[in-house]
Amino acid sequence: MTELSDDIFAELRKIDTPTITNVVATYPKNPLCLGLYNPWTENWYTDTSIRCLYPELGPTVGYAVTCVYGMPDPNYSGRLSFMDVLDALEAMKKPTILVIQQKWPDEIMKKAGLAGEMMVSSMMAVGCIGMLSNGPSRDVDAIRKLKFQYMLGGVTAGHGEMAVQSINVPVSVGGMDVAPGELIHMDENGAVKFPAHHAPAVVKNAQAMLDDEARRLVMIRKAKTAAEVRAANSGGAYTQKKA
């Protein structure tokens, strides 16, 4: 598994998630886009069901550790526990983001406040910096003070008995398919995933794209006519007016 330098992570944290998506797959005809996925047919970024609870933290980037939570099963429960999840977090390259797919009956899905201050503090002890989940969690104010990012399907105050169903398997959360070890980049706009070995190219191309956009924005903000706006966008991601 690719282990990235601290410098790469530092650069990734300077870049917003939409720019990362632009480079990963959004604009396949742009030479700066790596085209890692078909942008419409593959599930590589999250949808509107995921809410960022602490946008003030800025971009959060880490290696994915995955697990599935659901109702206790008398034929299986007890084989895995949250301690096994912590072991998986500890074994992964750092930093990590825990990606939890919650599988509950419909009547419970919006009421399972899975993680709270105790779980999050335990996760942080083994190098985890954020959690992404399709279901709710809780202890929002306490976790705000920990500078740990929550990307969730919602918030609720309680839960009943829960069980770990699997660890480090492919999961689907908020419309995004995630495999263990993939890199997750997330901020108030949502989350995107990509293979970790592409990170240096993602950083390089994202920086170039931001520089290009900054140059174009200067021209656009000075523009007074549609022709001037069109000229500023020439060669960029947006389609030019047909002759």
PLM feature spans:
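Intrinsically disordered, low-complexity regions enriched in acidic/Ser/Thr/Pro/Gln residues
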Residues: 1-92, 97, 212, 217-226, ...
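Generic structural signal for well-ordered, non-membrane alpha-helical segments
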Residues: 13-21, 60, 112, 116, ...
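Short coil/turn connectors at secondary-structure junctions
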Residues: 61-63, 93-96, 127-129, 145-148, ...
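Ligand/cofactor pocket segment of small-molecule handling proteins
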Residues: 120-157
